[in-house]
């Protein structure tokens, strides 16, 4: 189809398609004209006056209502009077006011594409003749910091940065091979924190089956994961891991630890009952059985004692009210409680100390030590005496202490036992030096004097004479011994 030159120009001028040109300035000028037409169309939409077809011009020759005219009028009216500034401030209250540098060019000249005196020639000239201004320049950063965001660190560099506590994303390690190499690199650093950090990433991005399978052949990382799961209390994942590794005993122990999260005593007791048949070792199985039995008895004792305390009919609960519940307490604490509140009960009751001793196979030393502390706290000295008194087959009585009488003396003194009680048990200490030290420490004067006399140690007796009160019975006793002619002193 043949067209004349005039037809082609008419086509390109009337068509919405623009001919390609290598002239950048013409291209920019056309874009500016398009922008001007868009702005004028907005003005036509907003303007509701009936005389839209009348073009009004200002004293400068610019059409009234154009963008340049609006900017000048707004700047002139708002900046000239305080009322105008307040009005402008009210209209722009939702925006942050930024200081604007004074401008020497008008937007109308840009839209027309022609120059004005004292202004820039054109937009293209302004861009080409003047240096580019950046009103919000980006601060320069070290090149190394940009690598944190571009994620171009190697495996070794990533692990090194993790070790130093630097920011380093692991998300770029997407394939299983890359993740496993990252884990091996972390293990080779022998840093538990780095290994744990990588394991947390693998735990989040890998399925349980793949994670467990790969850790099964990496024992160092496996131990770190087990420790981490125990620390955060993720029992479910820990049970799945032990089940995958076929570690029956550790699986049972992890299941047993879940009782710590059960607060209700009855529910905890029922849970412990389900743990009895789990594949524990022989020693652990006995402990689990004892734990269940102990909690079962504590529930019975607690209910009975709460009733006795509320009724107020028992002297021991009136004089010494309970400070805490016995539920979920250790075995030794339960034994102390029984020795304190139920010491005289018969062996057939659950709260009897003797019953607890036999049921849980409490050693004699532990039982005597606990019972002594409980009865001495109540100042029940007859019970203390009976605790250490034994009879032989001929009916003779003898005092015997599985824990040693030196410990008995210390516990009695801690509970403010009378001097007569202390002296009785200090005399039962077999080692002479220990006896003298305890007697001197707790001011058992008669024991010190008699021991020095038996040792025929005149110098030590004279030295002790200066420690007693003058004119006291102890001083008179020392003087009588020193003046005795029947004693052959060794010094």
Curated annotation (Swiss-Prot):
Keyword Ribosomal protein: no
Coiled-coil annotated spans: none
Localization, UniProt: Cytoplasm; Cytoplasmic vesicle; Early endosome; Recycling endosome
Domain of life the protein comes from: Eukaryota
Residues recorded with modification Phosphothreonine: 21, 115, 130
Database matches in InterPro entries: Spe-39, Vps16_C
One cellular component (GO) term of this entry: cytoplasm
List of residues that carry Phosphoserine: 119, 122, 128
Other known facts: Vipar-deficient inner medullary collecting duct cells display abnormal expression of membrane proteins such as Ceacam5, structural and functional tight junction defects and reduced E-cadherin expression.
Family of the protein in this entry: Belongs to the SPE39 family.
Name of the protein: Spermatogenesis-defective protein 39 homolog
Species annotation: Mus musculus
Organism lineage: Eukaryota, Metazoa, Chordata, Craniata, Vertebrata
């Amino acid at each position: 189809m043949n067209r004349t030159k005039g037809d082609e120009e008419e086509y390109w001028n009337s068509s919405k398609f623009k001919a390609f040109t290598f002239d950048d300035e013409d291209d920019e000028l056309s874009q500016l004209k398009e922008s001007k037409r868009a702005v004028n169309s907005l003005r036509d939409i907003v303007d509701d006056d009936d005389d839209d077809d009348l073009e009004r011009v200002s004293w400068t020759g610019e059409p009234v209502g154009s963008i340049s005219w609006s900017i000048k009028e707004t700047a002139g009216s708002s900046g000239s009077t305080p009322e105008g500034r307040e009005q402008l401030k009210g209209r722009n209250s939702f925006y942050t006011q930024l200081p604007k540098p004074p401008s020497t060019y008008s937007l109308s000249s840009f839209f027309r594409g022609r120059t004005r005196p004292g202004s820039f020639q054109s937009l293209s000239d302004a861009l080409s003749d003047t240096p580019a201004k950046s009103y919000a320049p980006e601060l320069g950063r070290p090149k190394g910091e940009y690598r944190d965001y571009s994620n171009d660190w190697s495996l070794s560099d990533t692990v090194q940065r993790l070790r130093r506590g630097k920011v380093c994303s692991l998300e770029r390690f997407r394939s299983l091979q890359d993740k496993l190499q990252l884990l091996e690199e972390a293990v080779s650093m022998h840093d538990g924190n780095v290994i744990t950090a990588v394991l947390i990433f693998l735990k989040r991005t890998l399925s349980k089956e793949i994670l467990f399978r790969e850790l099964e052949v990496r024992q160092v990382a496996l131990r770190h994961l087990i420790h981490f799961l125990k620390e955060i209390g993720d029992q479910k994942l820990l049970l799945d891991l032990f089940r995958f590794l076929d570690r029956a005993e550790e699986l049972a122990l992890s299941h047993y630890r879940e009782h710590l999260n059960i607060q209700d005593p009855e529910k905890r007791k029922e849970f412990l009952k389900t743990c009895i048949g789990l594949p524990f070792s022989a020693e652990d199985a006995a402990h689990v059985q004892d734990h269940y039995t102990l909690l079962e008895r504590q529930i019975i004792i607690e209910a009975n004692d709460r009733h006795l305390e509320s009724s107020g009919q028992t002297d021991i609960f009136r004089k010494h009210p309970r400070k805490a519940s016995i539920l979920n307490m250790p075995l030794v604490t339960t034994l102390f409680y029984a020795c304190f509140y139920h010491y005289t009960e018969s062996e057939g009751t659950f709260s009897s100390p003797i019953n607890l001793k036999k049921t849980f196979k409490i050693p004699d030393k532990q039982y005597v030590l606990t019972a002594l502390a409980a009865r001495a706290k109540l100042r029940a000295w007859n019970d203390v005496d009976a605790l250490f008194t034994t009879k032989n087959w001929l009916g003779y009585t003898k005092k015997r202490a599985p824990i040693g009488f030196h410990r008995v003396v210390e516990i009695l003194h801690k509970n403010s036992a009378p001097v007569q009680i202390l002296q009785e048990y200090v005399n039962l200490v077999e080692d002479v030096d220990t006896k003298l030290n305890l007697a001197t420490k707790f001011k058992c004067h008669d024991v010190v004097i008699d021991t020095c006399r038996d040792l025929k140690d005149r110098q030590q007796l004279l030295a002790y004479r200066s420690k007693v009160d003058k004119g006291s019975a102890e001083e008179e006793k020392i003087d009588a011994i020193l003046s005795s002619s029947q004693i052959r002193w060794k010094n």
